């Protein structure tokens, strides 16, 4: 298994027989070196979206067309894009599980909002979501954009993820302190990786706060396009 941060909330996850691009915002992302785009998307088999906001959907449509790969996510958004954008898609909903190249991906709840820009303003894009991704002896919790929520209790007990990819930039999502509290209260992670931070001054956060709040947990500060040891 190999995980690479693409900046902001974007990741490239190589697991089982799948290469999954999660929330691939590359073009215009101040953290991502655009001359490494081809390297970032090479061999991708699926695109997995947590919600419809532009800093998460990003390059989804262009990559899906270029590589002829399916976009996976909440049914409402995927169905809209299949109808109006002509892409291949796999839409499902919370509680559902899909098999992506041998990795079992279950959609779970998040607490945020979800829309994309239309000609006359924001367009509803279905509910925001997170994911539990099981494969190669691990379960990875991808929080998507969220705050602390009570659902995390049963999500932790039922899915028992050992790796957490947690939004922690504050302002639009939980910050480092809240992410640490959620991880400590509801999960038993061995490894935690923060994301959705440092992209803009508004999202400036100190990962040392997360580390201090999670004694005994390996907290990895990701570097863009540097494989993360798991």
UniProtKB/Swiss-Prot annotation:
SUPFAM superfamilies: Metallo-hydrolase/oxidoreductase (SSF56281). Coiled coil: none annotated. Keywords: Hydrolase. One of its GO terms (molecular function) is hydrolase activity. SMART domains: Lactamase_B. The keyword Hydrolase applies. Signal peptide: none annotated. This is UPF0173 metal-dependent hydrolase Pden_0574. InterPro entries: Metallo-B-lactamas, RibonucZ/Hydroxyglut_hydro, UPF0173, UPF0173_UPF0282_UlaG_hydrolase. PANTHER family: UPF0173 METAL-DEPENDENT HYDROLASE MJ1163, UPF0173 METAL-DEPENDENT HYDROLASE MJ1163-RELATED. Belongs to the UPF0173 family. It comes from the Bacteria.
């Amino acid at each position: 298994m190999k995980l690479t941060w693409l900046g902001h909330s974007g990741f490239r996850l190589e697991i089982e027989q799948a290469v999954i691009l999660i929330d691939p915002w590359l073009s215009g992302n101040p953290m991502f070196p655009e001359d490494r785009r081809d390297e970032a998307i090479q061999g991708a088999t699926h695109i997995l979206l947590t919600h419809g906001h532009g800093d998460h959907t990003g390059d989804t449509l262009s990559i899906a067309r270029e590589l002829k790969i399916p976009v996976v996510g909440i049914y409402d958004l995927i169905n809209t894009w299949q109808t109006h954008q002509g892409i291949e898609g796999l839409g499902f909903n919370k509680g559902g599980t899909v098999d992506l190249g041998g990795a079992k991906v279950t959609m779970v709840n998040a607490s945020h909002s979800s829309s994309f820009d239309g000609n006359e303003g924001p367009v509803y894009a279905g509910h925001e979501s997170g994911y539990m991704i099981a494969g190669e002896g691990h379960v990875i919790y991808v929080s998507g954009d969220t705050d602390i929520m009570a659902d995390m209790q049963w999500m932790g007990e039922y899915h028992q993820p050992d790796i957490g990819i947690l939004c922690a930039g504050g302002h639009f999502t939980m910050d480092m302190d809240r992410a640490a509290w959620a991880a400590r209260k509801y999960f038993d992670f061995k490894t935690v990786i923060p994301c959705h931070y440092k992209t803009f001054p508004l999202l400036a956060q100190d990962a040392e706060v997360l580390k201090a709040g999670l004694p005994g947990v390996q907290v990895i500060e990701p570097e863009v396009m540097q494989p993360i040891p798991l």
